[in-house]
């Protein structure tokens, strides 16, 4: 059941006021969300151990302990789990990011290592790992359920820089898109503070935006107008195929854009309740990435 954080708890307080530094294992640490979880934990004074299949190519901030491991091979996680109090888990793994079938074993190893808290990044479906975590009564679990990432707008960068335009279908669709840093912040609090066990946290931004709103915001941030070209479904499919998207991804995009679920177009105040500060706006995100949308 989705729940809202308790307003009476100590969310948003600094670590020094509420607890000692903890050691947290972050899986998917090189991913969009994982990197934000790492950064937020470090900012809060915790020790971070980052799991990756190839430590030699991983690039993390100073102070992060990088360890080798593969979620599709649970026993490879045993050294990484030693001494950690919490684990941030993704539910997909391997070269093709298939749903992890190893979830029950991963959870078993985490419990045996003394892990007290886990966060699970929801991937749009109930995977074996998420199901195992939800069914377990021996660790405090929090399912992190973000809506559309603000970072998805980076897919427009090439078209904006080269042609000064964005070509999209369903331009009136609404989205409560979320800053990835806010996802990381919520996960970091849930991993290190009391009161977040057995919770589902839907994480959104603070506003509803159309495609036109997003384009106008990016234009303001980069200081130059951007044309918005609305595509028909057929034109969009052709564009996605030309970009190399598989047919199942194209089907997903058509459904997600043409029939956005209510949860994706409803603003939730989870970020502020959990972290003690408002969710970041798309304007803030656009300002952070303005140079990406500028030529040269």
Where are these regions (language model features)?
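Cofactor-binding loops of NAD(P)H-dependent oxidoreductases
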Residues: 69
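A hydrophobic C-terminal alpha-helical subdomain
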Residues: 4-12, 233-296
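Oxidoreductase cofactor-interface core, primarily capturing Rossmann-like NAD(P)-dependent enzymes
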Residues: 2, 10, 16-62, 72-84, ...
């Amino acid at each position: 059941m989705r729940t809202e954080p308790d307003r009476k708890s100590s969310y948003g307080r600094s670590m020094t006021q509420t607890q000692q530094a903890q050691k947290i294992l972050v899986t998917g640490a090189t991913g969009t969300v994982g990197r934000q979880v790492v950064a937020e934990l470090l900012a809060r004074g915790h020790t971070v151990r980052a799991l990756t299949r190839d430590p030699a190519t991983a690039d993390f901030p100073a102070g992060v302990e990088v360890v080798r491991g593969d979620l599709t091979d649970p026993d490879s996680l045993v050294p990484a789990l030693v001494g950690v109090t919490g684990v941030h888990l993704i539910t997909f793994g391997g070269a093709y990011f298939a749903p992890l079938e190893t979830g029950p074993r991963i959870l078993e190893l985490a419990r045996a290592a003394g892990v007290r808290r886990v966060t699970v990044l929801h991937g749009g479906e109930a995977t074996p790992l998420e199901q195992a975590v939800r069914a377990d009564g021996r660790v405090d679990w929090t399912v992190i359920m973000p809506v559309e990432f603000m970072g998805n707008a980076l897919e427009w960068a090439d078209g904006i820089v080269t042609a000064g335009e964005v070509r999209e279908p369903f331009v009136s669709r609404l989205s409560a898109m979320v800053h990835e840093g806010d996802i990381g912040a919520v996960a970091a609090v849930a991993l290190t503070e009391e009161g977040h066990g057995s919770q589902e946290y839907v994480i959104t931004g603070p506003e509803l935006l159309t495609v036109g709103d997003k384009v106008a915001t990016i234009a303001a941030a980069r200081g130059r107008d951007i044309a918005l070209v609305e595509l028909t479904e057929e034109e969009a499919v052709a564009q996605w195929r030309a970009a190399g998207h598989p047919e199942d991804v194209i089907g997903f995009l058509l459904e997600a854009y043409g029939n956005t679920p209510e949860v994706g177009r409803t603003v939730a105040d989870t970020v502020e309740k959990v972290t003690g500060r408002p969710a970041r706006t798309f304007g803030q995100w656009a300002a952070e990435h303005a140079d990406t949308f500028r030529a040269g």
